Each structure stands twice: as structure tokens, then as C-alpha cells.
Amino acid sequence: MRIANKSEAVDYAYQTAEPQKQGWPLTAQEQEYILKPEFQRRPGSEKNKYLPNLWPIVPSAGFWEGRKWLDTHAQMVNHVQANTGSVDILLVGDSITQQWNSPLDVGKFNTAWQKHFGHYKTINLGIGGDKTQNILWRLDHGGLESIDPRLVILLIGNNNMFFTPETGVDPVANGIQMCVVNLREKFPKADVILVKIFPAHAPGNRFYEDIKQTNIALDKLHLEIDPKVQVLDLTSDLINLDGALKPALFLQDKIHLDQDAGYALYARKLKPLVEKSLRVKPAANDNKTISKQ
């Protein structure tokens, strides 16, 4: 795999009509484009083509009503640019990552993170609702040139399950792979821990079964053949022998982890992989997790 300079764009399978393919700040033309609902910006939409197999692997900005998603991303870019230089851990993902807590939330990381990783300088770039394509867009428009993480922890794909009736599961696995490729190209010195999608809902539920099949498809990509990539699968820790979720580990929505038991387990399982990657002392002099000022 060719490792590019941070400022270079990753080669994608399809080029949309997006006016600014990378970089920050955004031009007025780019802002106008990405404030359109996401379905209007999907690959092929500009040619009136239906290409759902490309949705998970081609960058697309996320969308909440109005400017909320873009404003959230902009706050994260500002946070990254205020914390330049060496960083121990960069967290990338959706709401499950965000709920380690982030600079946009309660101002400090949750109890499990602080217990196991609080001495590491950490930036959390988790945004609720994000899919693989949104992560790709954020990585290309995130002002990340100013930081140098030693380790990136990526968990993404859960929200892609809402669209697997159209996309299928293999493109989602390919989208996760593209996120890893993007991270490896932007941060060639960093290790990557890829966390496989957590089970959700119940056996027999489409969401549950599509997650299972996506993780199987991900296994077939053998991403861990790259010596700087580790893959973590918590499925067996999160379910009972009959496949049902362990209720103590999840919230009532059967998607998100319980802030106490769920994240405590997640942190314990992450810790050996983190310690393997961060073999020397934490970066920077303050040696602490970055939180909201």
C-alpha cells in the first residue's frame, strides 16, 4: 500500500461533483454543496445514477438538520488545531466513540477511559450518526496535518446498517477498509486499532445479522496483514451463548454501551492492544487526556 503525504488525497473509486475534495477551511461553494441532504450528494446522484455499492466507500459529509453536523465538525477541527504536535491516541468513529466523551460533551473523558488511558494525550473525533463515508470526508477535510498521533482507534460501520438493504454488507466492509487506508496514508507512523462493529438488537433482527455478516466480510479483507494494524473483536464478550446481547453491557436501545459496565469492558479489552502500540512513555509534557477547556 502506497503511503502518501498527509496533504494528499486518497484515491477513491468514484469522483462526485463535490467542488472541494480535501482541505480546510471550506470554500463557500463547498459549504453550499455539503449543506444539501446527504442523499442528494451520493455517488451517481449528479448523473441520475443509482450506485449504492459506492455509498460506503466514497467520501460524503454527514448531515443533521441545517448546519448542526458541519458546525460540530468545525468545532472538532478547531480543537485539533489547538492541540498541535504529538498525540498519543486519536479516537475516530461514531456515537460509540463519542461516548467515551469528547470536547463537545461533558468536558472530560468517561470513568473507564480515565482509569485505563487517562495518562495518554488523547483527541476524540467521534460524531454520532457517522457512517464510513462520513469518516472518509472528515479525514480529508479535518485539518489533521497539524497533529501526529502515535495510535488511532477506529470503530465505524454501525450506522451503515440502516442502508444495507440497498448497499449490501460487502461495500460496508470495503468502506471500513478505506477508512483504515486513509488513516494509514495520513499517519504512516501511527498504529491503528480497528474495532469490529459491536452486535446490536437481537439474533434474527436484520440489523444484528447484517453486522455479523459485515464483520465476516471484514475478516476476509485481512487488514491485520499490515503490521501496524490490529483488529479487536468484542462480539463474544458482548453476547451470551445464545447470541443475545448481555443486557448489563448495553443501554435500552440495544446499540450503545452502558457508561459503566459496557465501557469498563471495552476499556479492559482495548488496554493490551493500546499498551502494545504505545511501548514508550506518553507524548507531551502534560501526559493527560485532552478535555474541553
State the predicted function of each range.
Residues 1-92, 96-107, 111, 277-293:
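N-terminal secretory targeting modules
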Residues 70-80, 130-142:
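A Trp-anchored, charged/polar loop motif used as the substrate-binding/catalytic surface
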Residues 84, 117, 187, 225-226:
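A structural signal for short coil/turn segments at secondary-structure junctions
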Residues 88-93, 121-126, 150-156, 160, ...:
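Structural recognition of the beta-strand scaffold that forms the well-ordered cores
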Residues 91, 130, 134, 167, ...:
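Extracytoplasmic/secreted proteins, especially bacterial periplasmic and envelope-associated proteins
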Residues 98-111, 116-118, 132-177, 182, ...:
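Oxyanion-hole/transition-state-stabilizing segment in secreted/luminal serine hydrolases
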Residues 123-125, 162-169, 202-205, 252-257:
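Second-shell loop/turn segments in exported
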Residues 199-293:
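Catalytic His-Asp segment of secreted/periplasmic serine-dependent ester chemistry enzymes
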